[in-house]
C-alpha cells in the first residue's frame, strides 16, 4: 500500500496582547458594532515585538508534545511574514527546536499557505524523503498594516498553528486523502503587500502596507473555496452531505456563511473561531482546528475538508478523516 501522510499532533500559540474592538475604536473612526457586523471579529491577538519565528517556535513545540515526538525529519513554515526576506525562517525555527540537519523551508501562499503546506509535506512523506514532518502556519500580519486603515486593522490578527504528520497508510484516520490546488495570477493585485522585509513593512511608508480590494476578494473567495471543496469531495468520493466538518480559512463570517450556503451545508458544520482571533492568514486553519478540539466540536473519525483562499490568487482544499488527537497550546 502506498505511503500516506497522517496527522498525529496539533499545537497552537496566540500572543498575549489582545486588541478588542472597543480598544480599536478608541484609536480609529469605528465601533464594535461596525466591525462585528461586517467581519464577525470581536478581538484579535497582536504579536508586538515578537516575530513569526517566535510564534512558530511555540506552536511547533506544542504540536510535538501533542504527537509525543521530540524529533521530525522536516520543518515547513507556511508564512507571508517571515522574519527576513532572506534567509527563510524555517531553518532557524528548526535549529531552535534542536532539529539541526532537518529539511527546512518556508512556503508563501498567503491564506492558502497551510493547505499548500499540507500538500508539500504530504509529498515529502509519500516520496520517502521524510518519515515525519512539522508544518507550521504562522503570520504576524499586524506588522504589515497601515495604522490608520480601519478595514484591515479590524480584520487581521497574529498567531501560529502547527501539525505533526507521520508516514502511514490511507486507511488510517488522519491520512491526507485528496487535494485540490489552484491559482490565478492575473488577479495578484487584489491582495498584496509590496514590502519584502519586516524593516520595510515597519517603515511607516503607506506604499509598503498591505492592501486589498475587499469587494472583489469577497466574490472570489466564495467562488473559489466552494468550487475547490466540490472538486476535492468528488476526488475522495464524498457528497457535501457526507461532511461532518468544514474548516475554512477564517476570512470573515460573511464569506464563511456564503460558502456554507453554496455547498448547502448546515452552518453548524463549519468550524469558526474568527470572533476570538480574527483573520490570522496562514495560521487560521490550524488555529480553527485547535479551537474545534478544545470546544469538543470535532468528531474522531469524522469526514473533514480544510479549504483556503488567499493572495496570489491561490486556493486549495484537502480531505481527511479527523484522528483522535490531544491538542496542546503553548
Swiss-Prot record:
EC number of this enzyme: 2.3.1.180
GO cellular component: cytoplasm
Alphabetically ordered keywords of this record: Acyltransferase, Cytoplasm, Fatty acid biosynthesis, Fatty acid metabolism, Lipid biosynthesis, Lipid metabolism, Multifunctional enzyme, Transferase
Classification via CDD domains: KAS_III
Molecular function in Gene Ontology: 3-oxoacyl-[acyl-carrier-protein] synthase activity; beta-ketoacyl-acyl-carrier-protein synthase III activity
Catalytic reaction annotation: malonyl-[ACP] + acetyl-CoA + H(+) = 3-oxobutanoyl-[ACP] + CO2 + CoA
Pathway(s): Lipid metabolism; fatty acid biosynthesis
Transferase recorded as keyword: yes
Active site: 111, 249, 279
One GO process term, biological-process aspect: fatty acid biosynthetic process
Cited InterPro entries: ACP_syn_III_C, ACP_syn_III_N, FabH, Thiolase-like
Any one Pfam family match given in the protein's UniProt record, by short name: ACP_syn_III_C
Comment block on domains: The last Arg residue of the ACP-binding site is essential for the weak association between ACP/AcpP and FabH.
NCBIfam families, per database record: fabH (TIGR00747), PRK09352.1 (NF006829)
HAMAP family: FabH (MF_01815)
Function, as annotated: Catalyzes the condensation reaction of fatty acid synthesis by the addition to an acyl acceptor of two carbons from malonyl-ACP. Catalyzes the first condensation reaction which initiates fatty acid synthesis and may therefore play a role in governing the total rate of fatty acid production. Possesses both acetoacetyl-ACP synthase and acetyl transacylase activities. Its substrate specificity determines the biosynthesis of branched-chain and/or straight-chain of fatty acids.
Protein family: Belongs to the thiolase-like superfamily. FabH family.
Binding partners and assembly: Homodimer.
Protein name, per record: Beta-ketoacyl-[acyl-carrier-protein] synthase III
Organism: Pseudomonas aeruginosa (strain ATCC 15692 / DSM 22644 / CIP 104116 / JCM 14847 / LMG 12228 / 1C / PRS 101 / PAO1)
Lineage per the UniProt record: Bacteria, Pseudomonadati, Pseudomonadota, Gammaproteobacteria, Pseudomonadales
Amino acid at each position: 500500500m502506498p505511503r500516506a501522510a497522517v496527522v498525529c499532533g496539533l499545537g497552537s500559540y496566540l500572543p498575549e496582547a489582545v486588541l478588542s474592538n472597543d480598544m480599536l475604536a478608541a484609536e480609529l473612526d469605528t465601533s464594535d458594532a461596525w466591525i462585528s457586523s461586517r467581519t464577525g471579529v470581536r478581538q484579535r491577538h497582536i504579536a508586538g515585538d515578537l516575530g513569526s519565528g517566535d510564534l512558530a517556535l511555540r506552536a511547533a513545540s506544542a504540536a510535538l508534545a501533542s504527537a509525543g515526538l521530540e524529533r521530525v525529519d522536516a520543518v515547513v513554515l507556511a508564512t507571508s511574514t517571515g522574519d527576513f526576506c532572506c534567509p527563510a525562517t524555517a531553518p532557524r525555527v528548526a535549529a531552535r527546536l534542536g532539529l539541526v540537519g532537518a529539511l527546512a523551508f518556508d512556503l508563501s501562499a498567503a491564506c492558502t499557505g497551510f493547505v499548500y503546506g499540507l500538500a508539500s509535506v504530504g509529498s515529502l512523506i509519500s516520496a520517502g524523503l521524510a518519515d515525519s514532518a512539522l508544518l507550521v502556519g504562522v503570520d504576524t500580519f499586524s506588522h504589515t498594516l497601515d495604522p490608520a486603515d480601519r478595514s484591515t486593522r479590524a480584520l487581521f490578527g497574529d498567531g501560529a498553528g502547527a501539525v505533526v504528520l507521520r508516514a502511514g497508510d490511507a486507511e488510517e484516520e488522519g491520512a491526507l486523502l485528496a487535494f485540490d490546488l489552484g491559482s490565478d495570477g492575473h488577479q495578484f493585485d487584489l491582495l498584496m503587500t509590496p514590502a519584502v522585509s519586516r524593516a520595510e513593512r515597519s517603515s511607516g511608508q503607506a506604499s509598503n502596507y498591505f492592501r486589498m480590494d475587499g469587494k472583489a476578494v469577497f466574490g472570489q473567495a466564495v467562488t473559489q473555496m466552494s468550487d475547490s471543496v466540490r472538486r476535492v469531495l468528488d476526488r475522495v468520493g464524498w457528497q457535501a452531505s457526507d461532511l461532518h466538518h468544514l474548516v475554512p480559512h477564517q476570512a470573515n463570517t460573511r464569506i464563511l456563511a456564503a460558502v456554507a450556503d453554496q455547498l448547502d451545508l448546515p452552518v453548524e458544520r463549519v468550524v469558526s473561531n474568527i470572533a476570538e482571533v480574527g483573520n490570522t492568514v496562514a495560521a487560521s486553519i490550524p488555529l480553527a482546528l485547535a479551537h474545534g478540539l478544545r470546544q469538543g466540536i470535532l468528531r474522531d473519525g469524522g469526514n473533514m475538508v480544510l479549504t483556503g483562499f488567499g493572495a496570489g490568487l491561490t486556493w486549495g482544499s484537502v480531505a481527511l478523516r479527523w484522528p483522535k488527537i490531544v491538542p496542546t497550546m503553548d
